Design a protein with these regions (language model features):
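C-terminal extensions of enzymes
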Residues: 1-22, 28-37, 44, 140, ...
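Non-catalytic, usually N-terminal nucleic-acid engagement modules in DNA/RNA processing proteins
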Residues: 1-182, 303, 308-315, 333
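Short, solvent-exposed loop/turn segments at secondary-structure junctions
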Residues: 35-36, 68-70, 103-104, 153-154, ...
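Glycine- and acidic
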Residues: 155-160, 164, 213-222, 368-371
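Glycine-rich phosphate/ribose-binding loops and adjacent secondary-structure elements
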Residues: 168, 180-342, 346
């Protein structure tokens, strides 16, 4: 098995680490962010508008959920050049990661069987997917890496019997993947729901198999639950005591799903290396722009400034959104005459060219340019945050960054 990850620096505060994921197309410094796709494209962006993203940003690559291509396997097989070429992306520019389902939406539950996983296509129709079909799709899509076929339908308070079925089924799928000896890197799905002992056992079982990394799956959080998630109450014991200690340190850990900046930092502190852009996409869909503090320089000063600015806003506007420390809702008419960029210090295309007032107008008139501009800003802002995380780990100041988001 070819080694695809190395640790460059271990932080001093928790289990945070700086690493290099050695992709087929390019190497990526971790912690890293995958840009999530929907329906065969990066949401709201064409291959041309993708070029408006700052070239200095370091994304891990694109995450392509298979559920949007479940009807296209024969087409992709006939095309023969891989999913990135099919999407019209610049050759060899993007690492490609395939996951069975879209981690950024609320998929329907209750339809899996012992032999297959139910996926929902772009039209909302159910498609049963067994291992052979998923494996055929992977051969046609030619990804750099993929998440093993898995049953992650184990929400909080689900029956222990359901958890056991999910873990057994997922391990069986994983063994089938390993037998096929694909050229792509495989992230073995680690299931177990919210059951501490099952998580521990499953982590050990997956770690015994020759996989290239691990995907922490099976929390079954809705998007609204994910935004409200309290890591200390909901996940800390599961992740820090049951999962991470039972996975080998030298292999990368992946978590897919909506993550606020606070949750990202807590996952990083636990030793998780890769994430996806579901949170940025969710905020874009809601007409919100990310504004949380995301740069290395003057973090304390910036934190003070945002508190002062927020207090001033609250004094002048009794309807101030308490989440403005993280986002601003540009649907709100108080931005109708706000001619500032989304964030003064941001150098993304949107902030260099446009104002809050203009985006408020676009949202009010339901103009399709609104989600384009918000996507460009939110992806830029979110990835800049990851650059801040990487720098703080390198400089052994990660604990200070974490404190700012408590």
């Amino acid at each position: 098995m070819k080694k695809n990850f190395r640790i460059e620096h271990l932080g001093r505060s928790f289990k945070e680490r700086l690493g290099i994921w050695i992709g087929e197309k390019k190497n990526v410094t971790t912690p890293a962010l995958w840009i999530g796709c929907q329906g065969g494209a990066i949401p709201n962006l064409t291959p041309e508008t993708i070029e408006y993203l700052n070239p200095n940003l370091q994304f891990a690559g694109i995450l392509v959920p298979f559920q949007y291509h479940v009807r296209d396997v024969d087409v992709l097989e006939k095309y023969g050049k891989g999913i990135d070429a099919f999407m019209g992306l610049t050759p060899n520019q993007w690492n490609v990661l395939i996951s069975p389902q879209d981690p950024g939406i609320d998929n329907r539950h209750g339809y899996h069987t012992n032999k297959d996983i139910s996926l929902w296509d772009a039209a909302g129709n159910r498609v049963p997917v067994n291992f052979s079909f998923y494996n055929k799709a992977l051969q046609s899509m030619k990804p750099d890496a993929y998440v093993s076929l898995c049953d992650g339908e184990t929400p909080r308070n689900c029956a222990h019997k359901r958890i056991c079925k999910a873990t057994t089924r997922t391990l069986r799928f994983l063994d089938q993947h390993i037998e096929q000896k694909s050229n792509s890197f495989i992230f073995g799905a680690v299931e177990g729901g919210f059951d501490i002992e099952t998580r521990k056992t499953t982590a050990k079982q997956v770690s015994e198999r020759p996989v290239d990394g691990f995907c922490l799956d099976g929390f079954s959080l809705t998007t609204s639950e994910a935004v409200e998630l309290n890591f200390d109450n909901d996940l800390k014991q599961l992740i820090n005591e049951s999962v991470i200690p039972n996975l080998p340190e030298e292999k990368p850990k992946l978590y897919l799903g909506v993550c606020t900046p606070r949750i990202i930092l807590q996952f990083v502190a636990a030793g998780v290396d890769m994430f996806d852009s579901s949170y940025a996409k969710l905020m874009t869909d809601q007409g919100k722009a990310l504004v949380f503090q995301n740069t290395v320089s003057n973090l304390k000063e910036k934190c003070s400034n945002i508190v002062n600015e927020s207090l001033t806003t609250q004094k002048n506007d009794t309807k101030c959104d308490p989440e403005e420390f993280d986002t601003i809702d540009l649907n709100n008419m108080r931005y109708k005459n706000d001619f500032r960029p989304i964030k003064d210090s941001c150098i993304c295309y949107t902030c260099r060219k446009h104002t809050r007032a203009y985006i408020n107008h676009l949202l009010a008139t339901k103009e399709l340019l609104a989600p384009v501009l918000l996507t460009l800003h939110n992806l830029h802002h979110y990835e800049t945050f990851f650059e801040t995380i990487r720098t703080s780990i390198k400089n052994d100041t990660f604990n200070k960054l974490l404190v700012l988001f408590e």
